[in-house]
Amino acid sequence: MLIIALAASGLICTPPQGTDQLLARSERVIVVGEIHGTAEAPHAIGEIACAASEKEPVVVALELEDTLQPTLDAFIAAPDAATAFATLAGSTLLNRAVQDGRTSEGLLKLLQRVRVLKASGRDITLHAFQPSSIGRGDSLDQAWYELNMGFALGQARQKRPDARVIALAGNIHAQKTPLARYPDIGLPAAGHLPTRETLSFKIAQQGGYSWSCGADECGVSPSNVRYDVDARGVIWSPAEDGGFDGVLALGPWTASPPISGED
């Protein structure tokens, strides 16, 4: 009966294989790099956060505009799903000019997951770390943007030094070393965090689909198979000259469309 009750309340955690070993590590910041617009990535973050929140405070950090922080705070403080959804009205979570996959139905489910965990008494919060204080005009390389994003992500750790930070970002921002093919990026956001405290994982490309943007439009796009399709879970295999500590294999992706205007 207890298991049934926990399942009904959303308190049973189903994290990827290897999460226990990951959370046993001393590093306080875990960054997961994704291709935006899949159902699997935000779901995995929610379940890892669920498992972590059983033992310690957790901050779920998301690549969303920092100006959305009051909206996110109101969302997870809402007493029920309908009230929570109403807090999104008028925000870029529902009205985004470019639907690049970050504000997906999968993200909405992650937000609801965090809200339910918080309502149950878990010490868990959300933190938006896409900087709005600097643009990427012709006069500034993206390296400046990455610097600001790294600082904004670091604030999740500095404001809650007792908490484990679990962050979801695009693959480029999540890498800890420079990308030779993109010299204007310099050191990506995760590379600006203290090395001793930071782990970074890249979600494996195992086929399937994502909702992402190409040169001309945004929509459902196929993903190439670049990793063993049968692999699952947290896999420690350093890549990109130390840019990632391993991969998170979640299987073939399912495209997750933008959040609709109806709950």
Q: What are these regions, as identified by a protein language model?
A:
Residues 1-9:
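Sec-dependent N-terminal signal peptides
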Residues 9-263:
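Compositional signal for N-terminal targeting/processing segments
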